[in-house]
UniProtKB/Swiss-Prot annotation:
Membrane-protein topology: Peripheral membrane protein
Catalytic function, reaction form: ATP + H2O + 4 H(+)(in) = ADP + phosphate + 5 H(+)(out)
Record's keyword annotation contains Membrane: yes
Purpose of the protein: Produces ATP from ADP in the presence of a proton gradient across the membrane. The alpha chain is a regulatory subunit.
One cellular component term from this protein's GO annotations in UniProt: plasma membrane
Binding site for ATP: 178-185
Name of the protein in question: ATP synthase subunit alpha
Site (Required for activity): 379
Species this chain originates from: Roseiflexus castenholzii (strain DSM 13941 / HLO8)
Record keywords, A-Z: ATP synthesis, ATP-binding, Cell membrane, CF(1), Hydrogen ion transport, Ion transport, Membrane, Nucleotide-binding, Translocase, Transport
InterPro entries, sorted: ATP_synth_asu-like_sf, ATP_synth_asu_C, ATP_synth_asu_C_sf, ATP_synth_F1_a_nt-bd_dom, ATP_synth_F1_asu, ATPase_a/bsu_AS, ATPase_F1/V1/A1_a/bsu_N, ATPase_F1/V1/A1_a/bsu_N_sf
Protein's cellular compartments: Cell membrane
Gene3D superfamilies assigned to the protein according to its UniProt record, in alphabetical order: 2.40.30.20, ATP synthase alpha/beta chain, C-terminal domain, P-loop containing nucleotide triphosphate hydrolases
Quaternary assembly: F-type ATPases have 2 components, CF(1) - the catalytic core - and CF(0) - the membrane proton channel. CF(1) has five subunits: alpha(3), beta(3), gamma(1), delta(1), epsilon(1). CF(0) has four main subunits: a(1), b(1), b'(1) and c(9-12).
Length: 526
């Protein structure tokens, strides 16, 4: 027999609930129902108040102990289409979906330094949970013109060819573009390794890469001590297109936190961040997959119509802030993979038009042993020149033109049997400069050493050194400058040479080293 509670009993229960602090206020929850699901996309009815890019929750149920989240991307007349972040196989027709009233956010701040996380900011390195209470929306409007400052501080990549001819400044967006296996990632990783002790937090975002390749990159960063100031965001090829799509935005949010609020590295506050997107070609492919699954109309090469906005809203968030807003910076190095050296394809031309210059790496140069395989004619930096130190600017002013002319003359010389003395001398000097600019991976070179070596090459000091001895002469000159004239390197590094460059010490050191080098038997044999 069913018992019915009396009015007095109900009243006593209500009083008890009030004493225990139970919230009896009614809550409005926007709830929907899955009407169709497949390939990582769910179609949901009943979410009339859903916002664009809102985070949706698929609550736990039998067989699923944790909630699954999605992002509302298509707001249609009778339904909402959402991409599912995570395992969508457990989601079925008829499942409940809750609105959260917020957009997707990523954890940010000090606790992420040295960690490897997925696109949602969850740790995947086996080092335990990330202890942070700071979160930022992954999507955000880029800083306005009033908050920005012109680029005037260099990012030293440690790669002599780039620092001299295509300089990068803090707050710049510099594209690294080329075919597969031309050294694009190597340039980015060398740049990260070279930031040790330079007050820069680095973020490496792997999009659509193989897991083995990402693990190898992490091992290199740990080996060279770069993980002490680096965050790795990984959305590998084995993960869903939805996670690959949001990964660069999550990494950018982490970089913006450094730029605006700073972190502590080696006891010093750091407000400069460098972010590498490796690569945005695979990011565009992931977004194309998501868009086609959402039934959005395809355009050129089957990409959706807003694929330009996909990358422009990401890369515009790189900035140099003025002193009123903290003076921090976020420098972006996006990577694009071309097919058969075609830089005029859809995605490459989009990103070239967004960025402040590009570093173009060429397959033929790479196969010829010229590494980094930099094509000087196509590569350019639109703003980084203002960030070069005086000493580097003084030695590199002519270098790019000389190298571009050398490549043209070298191509012409293949078909010409008789060359005049001036042309021959120009080609021979260009060959020596080409050797000077060669550099092995994982061996970034300090600024002061770059300046001395370039000065020797540009001013003809190496004209009598055999080409196969240039590498050895470089290393011996650097060692001599370190031991005999350390004060010169310090002056170059601190940008104190002013108009005295080149100092007499640099000239005398090069001449002394050249004289000693000529006396060696190996020189004569060369």
């Amino acid at each position: 027999m069913m018992t019915v509670a009396t009015t007095e009993e109900l009243y006593q229960r209500l009083l008890k609930s009030i004493r225990e602090g139970v919230d009896l206020q009614p809550k409005m929850v926007n709830v929907g129902t899955v009407i169709q699901v497949g390939d990582g996309v769910a179609k949901i009815s009943g979410l009339e108040q859903a916002m664009a890019s809102e985070l949706l929750e698929f609550p736990p149920k039998a067989g699923r102990s944790e909630p699954v989240f999605g992002i509302a991307l298509n707001l249609e007349k009778d339904a909402v289409s959402a991409i599912i972040l995570g395992d969508y196989l457990g989601i079925e027709e008829g499942d409940q979906v809750n609105s959260t009233g917020r957009v997707i956010s990523a954890p940010v701040g000090q606790a992420l330094i040295g960690r490897v996380v997925n696109a949602l900011g969850q740790p995947i390195d086996g080092k335990g949970p990330i202890q942070t209470t700071k979160y930022r929306p992954i999507e955000r409007i880029a800083p306005g013109v009033i908050t920005r400052k012109s680029v005037d501080t260099p990012v030293q990549t440690g790669i002599i060819a780039i620092d001299a001819m295509i300089p990068i400044g803090r707050g710049q967006r510099e594209l690294i573009i080329g075919d597969r296996q031309t050294g694009k990632t190597a340039v980015a990783i060398d740049t990260i390794i070279n930031q040790k002790g330079k007050g820069m937090v680095c973020i490496y975002v792997a999009i659509g890469q193989k897991r083995a390749q990402v693990a190898q990159i992490i091992n290199f960063l740990e080996k060279y001590g770069a993980m002490d100031y680096t965050i790795v965001v990984s959305a590998t090829a084995s993960e869903s297109a939805a996670l690959q799509y949001i990964a660069p935005y999550a990494g950018c949010a982490m970089g913006e936190e450094v730029m605006e609020n700073g972190v502590i590295i080696d006891g010093q506050e750091v407000r400069d961040a460098l972010i590498v997107y490796d690569d945005l070609s695979k990011h565009a492919t992931a977004y194309r997959q998501v868009s086609l699954l959402l039934r959005r109309p395809p355009g050129r090469e089957a990409y959706p119509g807003d694929v330009f906005y996909l990358h422009s809203r990401l890369l515009e968030r790189a900035a140099r802030l003025n002193e009123d807003y903290g003076g921090g910076s976020l420098t972006a190095l996006p990577i694009i993979e071309t097919q058969a050296n075609d830089v005029s394809a859809y995605i490459p031309t989009n990103v070239i038009s967004i960025t402040d210059g590009q570093i173009y790496l060429e397959t033929d140069l790479f196969n010829a042993g010229i590494r980094p395989a930099l094509n000087v004619g196509i590569s350019v930096s639109r703003v980084g020149g203002a960030a070069q130190t005086r000493a580097m600017r003084s030695v590199s002013d002519r270098l790019k033109i000389d190298m571009a002319q050398f490549r043209d003359l070298a191509a012409f010389a293949q078909f010409a049997s008789d060359l005049d003395a001036t042309t021959r001398a120009q080609i021979e000097r260009g060959q020596r400069l080409q050797e000077v600019l060669k550099q092995p991976q994982f061996q970034p070179m300090p600024l002061e050493e770059q300046v001395v070596i370039l000065f020797a090459g540009i001013n003809g000091y190496l004209d009598d050194v055999p080409i196969n001895q240039i590498g050895r002469f470089k290393s011996e000159l650097v060692n001599y400058m370190r031991t005999a004239h350390p004060e010169v390197g310090k002056m170059i590094f601190e940008n104190r040479l002013d108009r005295k460059f080149p100092s007499p010490e640099i000239r005398s050191a090069i001449e002394h080293m050249l004289k000693e080098f000529k006396q060696m038997s190996t020189f004569a044999e060369g």
